[in-house]
């Protein structure tokens, strides 16, 4: 595997793990507290990334989207 392929693989793996950590619907994933991110200033790049994520329906720990999806619970 070349160094470019290795770097790409690592970046994709990191991205998948990050999405798993912040996706609220995913079972058995870590949930970080939202109040910890409230003090972090948002730069233009993060603001753009958050607007794209919110438009796609993802609400992450870093991005606080105004439109939230409802929580669906199932009972067995």
Curated annotation (Swiss-Prot):
Primary location recorded for the protein, binned into one broad class: secreted
Location relative to the cell: Secreted
Molecular function in Gene Ontology: acetylcholine receptor inhibitor activity; potassium channel regulator activity; toxin activity
Superkingdom of origin: Eukaryota
Propeptide cleavage-removed residue intervals: 25-39, 71-76
Signal peptide: 1-24
Keywords per UniProt: Acetylcholine receptor inhibiting toxin, Amidation, Disulfide bond, Ion channel impairing toxin, Neurotoxin, Postsynaptic neurotoxin, Potassium channel impairing toxin, Secreted, Signal, Toxin, Voltage-gated potassium channel impairing toxin
Recorded GO CC terms: extracellular region; host cell postsynaptic membrane
Modified residues (Arginine amide): 69
Keyword Secreted: yes
Cysteine pairings via disulfide bonds: 50-63, 54-65
Record bears the keyword Disulfide bond: yes
Transmembrane segments: none
Tissue specificity of this protein: Expressed by the venom duct.
Function, as annotated: Highly inhibits both nicotinic acetylcholine receptors (neuronal (alpha-3/beta-4) and muscular (alpha-1/beta-1/epsilon/delta) subtypes) and the voltage-gated potassium channel Kv1.6/KCNA6 subtype.
Similarity-based family: Belongs to the conotoxin J superfamily.
Domain topic, free-text comment: The cysteine framework is XIV (C-C-C-C).
Record's protein name: Conotoxin Bu28
